[in-house]
Amino acid sequence: KKEKEQGCYEDFIECLKLYDKEENGTMMLAELQHALLALGESLDDEQVETLFADCMDPEDDEGFIPYSQFVQRLMSDPVVFD
């Protein structure tokens, strides 16, 4: 796909900032999971778990993850589903 169709890093970050209530570059892992399941390309639970395993830093004690690293990893090495 063309880059325009896939979106760019800044577009993804702007969308995820909507969930960043503390404005500190983190969001709840559960909110990211919900967004991936409910919005955009429809992914199933197994696909979301694969994304998290491949691209995600561990969540902190309060359940937050740094979303910019997730997007960077996802875009630099896309996960392909059959």
From Swiss-Prot:
| Cellular component annotations (GO), alphabetically ordered | muscle myosin complex
| Any one Gene Ontology molecular-function term assigned to this protein's record | calcium ion binding
Q: Which UniProt keywords apply?
A: Motor protein, Muscle protein, Myosin, Repeat
Q: Which PROSITE patterns does this UniProt record tie to the protein? A: EF_HAND_2
Q: Which domain of life is it from?
A: Eukaryota
Query: Signal peptide position in this chain?
Result: none
Subunit structure as annotated in this protein's UniProt entry? Myosin is a hexamer of 2 heavy chains and 4 light chains.
Q: Protein name, please?
A: Myosin light chain alkali
Upper classification of the source organism reads: Eukaryota, Metazoa, Ecdysozoa, Arthropoda, Hexapoda
